[in-house]
Amino acid sequence: MTQLFIGLIAEGKTDYRFFQPIIEKTLTNIAFDCSGQIDIDVKVINCEKGDSFKDYVLNASKKGLQEYGISILIVHTDADDSNSIAAYDNKINPAKALLQTQPQNTHCNKIAALVPVRETESWMLADKDAFIKSIGTKKNINELNINGNPEDYTNPKERIENAIRIGREYMPKKLRTNLNISDLYSYLGQAIQINSLRNYNSFIDFENNIKSVFQELNLIPTQN
C-alpha cells in the first residue's frame, strides 16, 4: 500500500469545513484508477500567508513537505468572476512557476488548483435537494430563488443567506434565527455527491488537475 499525504490551503476557515470532505471523496474516486492500493491523508496546512498569494503557496509548500511529507498541495482560491481565467493568470500560474524554482527537497512542487467560479458558495448549491433539506424547509427552488446555475449568480453567498431567511420565515422566531450560512459548510460538504458537482466546469477542472498530478507521480496511467 502506498501512503499519500496531500496538503490543503484555502482562503478561509469555512472553506476548509466545506472542501475537505469534497476533496476526500474526489481523491477516493480517482484512487480507484491507481495501479495499486493507496491510502490518502489530507492535511490542512496552517502557515503564514505572507504578503501575497505566492508567499502563501510557497510557505505552505515548504511546511507541508517538512512537517507532513506531502506529495501534492491543493490550493483553493475563488475565481471572483464568471470564469477562472484571471485566477489562473494572476494567482495559480505565477505560484506554480515560483515553486518550480525551489529545491524539491525543501518544497512540494506539485500543485492542484481548486478554483470555484464566483466563490465557494456556488458549489454549496450543487445539490439543491441537499441544501433544501439542510435548512429544514418545504419550499422549492423557485420559492427560495435558487433556480438556475449557481455559478451564474453574481453573489452566491447572498443567495444562500436569502434562501435561509425565506425558507425559515414561517417558523417561530427562536427557530427562524438559529441557523445561518456558517452552519451549512460542513453538512453540505459531507452531503453533496461528486456526480452533482460534475455539473460544474470548475469542479471538472479541479478533478482534472488532480488526475494530472497523479499522472506526473505515476500513480495513474497517462491518457492518450
Q: Residue spans of the language-model regions?
A:
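Non-catalytic terminal and connector segments of soluble metabolic enzymes
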Residues: 50-54
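Short polar catalytic/cofactor-binding loops
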Residues: 12-14
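C-terminal accessory helical subdomains adjacent to catalytic cores in phosphodiester-
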Residues: 1-3, 16-46, 57-224
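Conserved beta-strand elements of the Class I
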Residues: 5-9
